[in-house]
Amino acid sequence: GIDPNFRTSRPVTGDHAGHKVYAPADPPVKEKALGIHG
């Protein structure tokens, strides 16, 4: 299921393509590769 606290349990690191980007649980390798700022 979807974690109802997802939006509040993880810090917002930025905004990308109109969607909020949340700090990844794993090292941000994919995020950096995609150029998502944080």
UniProtKB/Swiss-Prot annotation:
One of its GO terms (molecular function) is metal ion binding. Its cofactor is [3Fe-4S] cluster; [4Fe-4S] cluster; Zn(2+). The modification N6-methyllysine is found at residue 30. Residues 1-38 are annotated as: Disordered. Keywords: 3Fe-4S, 4Fe-4S, Electron transport, Iron, Iron-sulfur, Metal-binding, Methylation, Repeat, Transport, Zinc. Residues 1-38 are annotated as: N-terminal extension. Coiled coil: none annotated. Residues 28-38 have a biased composition (Basic and acidic residues). Residues 1-11 have a biased composition (Polar residues). Disulfide bonds: none annotated. Transmembrane segments: none annotated. The keyword Ion transport does not apply. Binds 1 [3Fe-4S] cluster. Binds 1 [4Fe-4S] cluster. Zn(2+) binds at residues 16, 19, 37. Ferredoxins are iron-sulfur proteins that transfer electrons in a wide variety of metabolic reactions. This is Zinc-containing ferredoxin. It comes from Metallosphaera prunae. The gene is zfx.
